[in-house]
């Protein structure tokens, strides 16, 4: 049986955090050992420097996706960014692949619509942070690999969005207020 998206992501995150050598290859593993994947602001600074170093070497996303070890690197780093958001905002995280996310969106639509997820690489990994915020961290990688320092701004904007969406409106029905608090 194929592991779920969450199992695959959590496996990658486990090896990043514990610094244990995984039974599969992750590109630039030696360099990743120098990053403290401890959900601190320092970890984001180290991650930004890692991406800046890759940009100086002109390493682009298609090159990384050309082999499995590069794919593991890309997914692991994107997953850490989304997991960082969830952990630092105190929210639960759920992971979806393209098919699962498409089905989730179809269930949430109250009215039949033609809107769908684009069929592209960036939609292949989506994190639901809390109950309402969806994050596609793979979309951030091209800018990071071009040397753009967009990670702090992305984290700040997404953190604000997560906090706004997790607030409980006390003017709602008592059941909705209770559900809002229990969901946290």
Model-inferred region functions:
Residues 1-76:
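N-terminal low-complexity, intrinsically disordered segments
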Residues 105-184:
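A recognition module on extended beta-rich or small alphabeta surfaces enriched in W/G with H and D/E
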Residues 14-15, 39, 80, 84, ...:
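Sequence-level detector for tyrosine residue identity
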């Amino acid at each position: 049986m194929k592991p779920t998206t969450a199992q695959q992501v959590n496996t990658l995150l486990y090896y990043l955090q514990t610094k244990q050598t995984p039974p599969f290859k992750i590109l630039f593993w030696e360099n990743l050992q120098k990053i403290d994947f401890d959900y601190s602001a320092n970890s984001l600074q180290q991650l930004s420097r890692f991406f800046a170093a890759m940009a100086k070497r002109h390493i682009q996303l298609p090159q990384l996706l050309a082999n499995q070890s590069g794919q593991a690197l890309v997914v692991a780093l994107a997953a850490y960014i989304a997991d960082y958001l969830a952990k630092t905002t105190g929210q639960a995280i759920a992971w979806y692949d393209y098919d699962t996310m498409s089905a989730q969106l179809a269930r949430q639509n109250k009215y039949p619509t033609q809107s769908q997820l684009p069929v592209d690489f960036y939609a292949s990994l989506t994190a639901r942070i809390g109950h309402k915020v969806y994050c596609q961290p793979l979309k951030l990688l091209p800018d990071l690999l071009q040397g753009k320092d967009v990670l702090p701004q992305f984290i700040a904007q997404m953190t604000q969005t997560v906090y706004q969406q997790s607030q409980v409106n006390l003017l709602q029905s008592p059941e909705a207020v209770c559900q809002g608090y229990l969901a946290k």
